Amino acid sequence: MEALEVDDISPALEVTEDFFNSFDKLENGVHQSHVFGIHQVPEFLGNEISNKMKEQADGQNANTSQRSIIWERCKSSLFDAKTMNGIHAKEQNESTKRTYSDDPLLSEKEKGTSTFNLLRRLDRPHSVNDSLDHLEDAPKFKPGHNRSRSDVSHIDWKNIRKPAPLQRSSSQGMHCTSPFSEPRNKNMEANNEVRSSFTNILKKGFLETRITPESFWKGCYAEISQYELHIYGSDYSGNHNATDTYHLSHIESITITGSHETKLVNVIMTDDRYLQLKADSAWEAIDWGQKLWEAICALNLVPNYRSIHQDILKKQNNFSDGIRGCMENNVNKLTPSAMNISNGNQKNIIKTGTLYRLTIQSNWKAFTFVLSNSHFAAYQPSCLDEDPLLSYNIDACIAVQMDMLDGYDSCFQVIFPQDVLRLRTETRQRAQEWMDAIISAANSARKSDQSLLVPLRKKSKENQSVKDLQRSKRQSVTTSFLSLLTSLALERGLTAQSFKCAGCQRPIGLSNEKAKVCSYSGWYYCSTCHVDDGFIIPARLIHNWDTSKHKVSKQAKEFLEYVYEEPLIDVHQENPLLYRHVDALAHVVRLRQQLKSLRAYLFSCRAVVAEDLRRRIFPREYLFQQIHLYSLSDLQQVVEGKLAPFLLKIIKFATSHVYSCSLCSQKGFICEICNNGEILYPFEENSTSRCENCGAVFHSDCKVRTVPCPKCVRKELQKKQKSFWQQLDMDGSLDEACSMFELSYQST
């Protein structure tokens, strides 16, 4: 505490002290008779002394020593400041005023008492520094005291006054600490720090809330703590009082809706209560929803949740047994229930937050990362209920290290066998926290896996089934490799990989081992992870019909071998012009169209025939279901000329059945253009043609004529009104009749 300055002592106080010192001279001198009369003093000094004596006489029966000063500690959660108001307590009972007579026979006891009562006025603070000096010795305010502001020391509020405090209204009687709020000490000095310095306040600020979509918006001040969402309202005097408290364990779902300009946070409780929050901006609303979700997920990380609050109850020694029992019952009721989390990876969550990931385009993009005991997943912001965009097994993490290449001190790398994540946070401290959490989670996951594998007997490779081998291959498939299946990879350079192998993280390039580029992924590998294996690149085959084999890494070869027979390539969607430039592929698509037409006949016949067709084409049923869908094996067979003979063999079996079957042979068409009575079938593509709109079959020679499809004409005429039929000359030729109206379809 600073010492008193010279300017803080008023001249009136100095004169008053000189006046009080005169009593000491009277006590030390010889006792003799004195006549108390009127003394001549300056006018301003006389008024000051008379006022002091009058005020002292009014309160002489009150205990106005150091307990007469009551300090009110005001905390502001908005501006992180503390304001202290010095308030003098004025007692309710006024005593009878004393008067000094001219009688010289005053007892020495009464004189000493009067002198002591007057000298007690020196304890009043007359400046700001005086007020601060009395802080340590001043007793604390207790609820229920009657405060009087008629005797307040003057303080220059322009210099030290802060905005109105944001605090909860104190209730009368015993105040029970909420089991979900921060613990309080019996000594109120524990609350001297501002609320914003508490680590359990995750977010705070001003919002607008409403409890139903039809109600009006109300402005409020909100805080998210570790266990609760507090809503504060303002009264007429501007003070903020707690109006609602929502326990985070009772929140069932959190959704964010609205447009790009305005976002709303919708909160639904387990008891069907509804709360809607609106912030000043869309990003602020998203942040509120994110902080709520993080606080809910953090509840799963508190196994001794109930014992924490029982310890808080034990510290409150002044609670009665009845109140303590009530509080314990409330703790049992408010124990957080199991959260309804859609994704299994979100169980046992260790850490969540927003991180920035470096994309292929060398841009930093924000994602919501969730670290659990088994996975490290990335979600789209505000889309936490959906499936993760990226997901990695945490036990497969190879290394976690700082990344200082881009000039940021808050960048770090999380290295997995199939991918390298370059992440960035706002501060270096937060990056270090994420690194420590990932390393500890990976170590614990490896220890648990090793403990589980010890009692199990390892199977030999000879006894492993085909499904086990396929399952082991699926574990190596990643989203990054799958996205490059139909896209040409770009070489990003060794700098993007920090001059490390994408497989084993061994240093490569420059003076280290020679780097080898993978033609499929564009990543660089060492000579151990890249042994110059040759493979057809699907993207080069689709876009350039490049049938040559290129050098790929072991990872890429393993991935391509796994998806080799999977129908993942849609030629019509990726490059439809390929049918024009590659005759072999155009011939195959015609055969598949013919097989698709035969499928309709055989699947509408007896079940034995349909089962025979499935058996002949198994497991590639997509060949007659989606005619433009290919696997990498199919495209290689097209190049080698093996797919067309395979399809012709199946077509021969199906056509022989249709011609010989009494049921299927009756499902033919008659050319409505020539009407010669010959039965036509849609799979006879060499001699027939089919309407794209209605599916009618005609002769190929008849289709050359520019005559619209008669079946489509009939459908169009059925939609016309009666007035149209009166104008139509049905005796005329078909061309004249068709020319009288405009058809809404293309001519065949």
Swiss-Prot record:
InterPro entries in alphabetical order: DEF8 (IPR051366), PH-like_dom_sf (IPR011993), PH_domain (IPR001849), PLEKHM3_PH_1 (IPR037812), RH_dom (IPR025258)
Keyword Oxidoreductase: no
Signal sequence, start to end: none
GO biological process: myoblast differentiation
Alphabetized UniProt keyword annotations: Cell membrane, Cytoplasm, Golgi apparatus, Membrane, Metal-binding, Repeat, Zinc, Zinc-finger
GO molecular-function terms, A-Z: zinc ion binding
Domain PH: 200-297, 348-443
Major subcellular location class: cytoplasm
Subcellular location as annotated: Cytoplasm; Golgi apparatus; Cell membrane
Domain of life the protein comes from: Eukaryota
Alphabetical list of Pfam families matching this protein: PH, RH_dom
Chain residue ranges for the region called Disordered: 88-107, 129-187
Sequence ranges of Basic and acidic residues compositional bias: 129-140, 148-159
Biased composition (Polar residues): 167-180
Zinc finger (Phorbol-ester/DAG-type): 656-709
One GO cellular component term noted in the UniProt record for this chain: plasma membrane
Known function: May play a role during muscle differentiation.
Protein name per the record: Pleckstrin homology domain-containing family M member 3
Organism: Xenopus laevis
